[in-house]
Amino acid sequence: MRTDAAGGTYLDPSAADVTALLERVHLVGIGGAGMSGIARILLARGRQVSGSDARDSRTVLALKAQGAHIALGHRAENIEQFDGDPTAVVVSTAIRRDNPELVAAQERGVPVLRRAEALAALMADHRVACVAGTHGKTSTTSMLTVALQHCRLDPSFAIGGDLNESGANAHHGDGGVFVAEADESDGSFLVFAPSVAVVTNVEPDHLDHHGTAEAYTEVFQRFVERIEPGGVLIACADDAGAALLADQAEAAGVRVRRYGHEVTADGDARMVGYRPEHGSGVVTVEVSGDRLDVQVAVPGEHMAANAVAALLAGLELGAPLEGLLEGLAAFGGVRRRFEFKGRADGVRVYDDYAHHPTEVDAQLRAARPVVGDGRLVVVFQPHLYSRTAAFSGEFATALGLADEVVVLDVYGAREDPQPGVTGELIAESVPLPAERVHYEASFTAAAPLVAGLVQPGDLVLTMGAGDVTMLGPEILAEVERESGATEEDA
């Protein structure tokens, strides 16, 4: 047991009593991507689950239908939804220390678990595969999960996005394998002990928590040290940060498999070609002397690299090659990862979660072949004041790959505003003619603005980790209103 500065009781997730605590569980912020996944698995395992969230949502309604007792708003009495106190309260890093439910749990001596600690306890008695990296975690974890499902291995999984196939971000399976997205943002992935660890890339981010790029890199080094004896690190050799990790791990005696364009060792996956197809692609890979064509059902070379990582991880988990290839070809994508939202008057609208300059760059390059003869119109909402201040120039450069850019104001999430840090900081540096770059501080004015800019054949891409995802349907409605035409989704 340990106590933090706020007086909360925390437990070592490797201890046997942590799993025993997950009987009557209250989750603060249960509607979030990570917390809802834990709730789904607990419910599937027959545990009692209560929770709270700031607002109603599709996720909250789905969890209620599964049997969770959920209150809207945060109040101390919300933890009293069981007969007696909960056996544990689970919180995410988004929950402030003065949250009344967290305070009530601390005052009553109810054990408090961080989200990752609860997830680690759910992994007990499973062979664990964790996917980490600055970018590509959700897509790679999802590809691996779907590929294993096609091999009929029925993995348990917890992902930071909803699979389009099932609409779920988590599942309790009977296959003895647990696949999880490992979030480095607060360092909490250090509680996991995977036998298969994937690192897609390492590039400075979340400096609001880690402080420096060096500290951010160090937390990945510590994650690799958590790999179980006899386990394997799968790392992207094309990324400098991941390649350095791989070299360090190998020197420490960890078995390493690399993927990328220049790898040469037996067991590595060398990507020797990529052919884009409409809305998808094919990557040619050489592995242990075999040459494979891997069909990837989502566009972009970055997605092809993610698929190769998933392929190697699946092989390490004992899945058959043919089944993995079939699963990757059938992969239906993840919600908010270049997700098609609809079409109106010849204008297609997609939505994507990209919120780091490298992600924005990769997704715009992937979208370009899909655009065709029209224009690529991007609506970008910066996420976090700290990230906007640190990377405004890089964001501007990446957005210059579009034909028309609308930059919204910053979605602050957990952060307070910073003087002088707005979306305009990015917009004023986008390397496009001024008439093709628009800063719109009013969220409600964004959809009418975009509808007035687009023409038939254009592709609109809303982009960011905040509530910009809500704009897609509004843009479609505005386009229909202006044109007087309605088209069926395609």
Swiss-Prot record:
Keywords for the protein's UniProt record, in alphabetical order: ATP-binding, Cell cycle, Cell division, Cell shape, Cell wall biogenesis/degradation, Cytoplasm, Ligase, Nucleotide-binding, Peptidoglycan synthesis
Short name of any one Pfam family annotated for the protein: Mur_ligase_C
Its EC top class is ligase
Q: Which SUPFAM superfamilies match?
A: MurCD N-terminal domain, MurD-like peptide ligases, catalytic domain, MurD-like peptide ligases, peptide-binding domain
Catalytic activity reads: UDP-N-acetyl-alpha-D-muramate + L-alanine + ATP = UDP-N-acetyl-alpha-D-muramoyl-L-alanine + ADP + phosphate + H(+)
Q: Which family does it belong to?
A: Belongs to the MurCDEF family.
What's the stated role of this polypeptide?
Cell wall formation.
Protein's recorded name: UDP-N-acetylmuramate--L-alanine ligase
Species the sequence originates in: Saccharopolyspora erythraea (strain ATCC 11635 / DSM 40517 / JCM 4748 / NBRC 13426 / NCIMB 8594 / NRRL 2338)
Q: Which gene encodes it?
A: murC
